[in-house]
Each structure stands twice: as structure tokens, then as C-alpha cells.
Amino acid sequence: MIVTTTSGIQGKEIIDYIDIVNGEAIMGANIVRDLFASVRDVVGGRAGSYESKLKEARDIAMDEMKELAKQKGANAIVGIDVDYEVVRDGMLMVAVSGTAVRI
């Protein structure tokens, strides 16, 4: 499945705009506290363990969005947006959304 942040796909014609699709992932209540604990883990200015948690959450949300698009008969998603939010009790939410299309 093609997934892009742009409104179209170069060299492809969108033949049907199907629906808005989304996916969310919420990571454990200790993620913010763990961020500060992982300061020891900083190498070259990057917090490796925190980045891996962000990637894991983003991958889960993206997979959920792709599966929903597939169920609706789409073979691509355009205009995707990825948002990161710290919600109550220090939980991290990653939300992705886009438009499911058929090319």
C-alpha cells in the first residue's frame, strides 16, 4: 500500500476517494517518566530508548490505519498526518490520519 503525506501520487491517477482513515496508539503510563530516566541513554544528543518507543507507537498507528484503508477497498492513503500528544498520567498517544484512495 502506498502511503504519502502529499495530496497525490506522482505518476498515478486517483480514481476514487474512499474515506478518511485513522489509527491511534497509546503507550504506557510511564513513558514520560521513562523519558527522563533515559537521559542516561542519550548518545550523540539522541535518546535511543525514547525514540524506539515513539517508532513503535507510530508503526502501530500506521498499521491500524493501513488495515482500515484496506478493509474499505483502498490501495493507497494520501495526505497523511502524524500527531504526537502526551495525554493524562504521562501516556503518549500517536494519532495518524489520511484519505483512503483507489489508484
Curated annotation (Swiss-Prot):
Domain of life: Bacteria
Any Pfam family matching the protein: YbjQ_1
Transmembrane portions of the chain: none
Cysteine pairings via disulfide bonds: none
UniProt cross-references to InterPro entries, sorted A to Z: UPF0145_dom_sf, UPF0145_YbjQ-like
Entries under HAMAP family matching the protein: UPF0145
Family the UniProt entry places it in: Belongs to the UPF0145 family.
Protein name per Swiss-Prot or TrEMBL: UPF0145 protein BT9727_3206
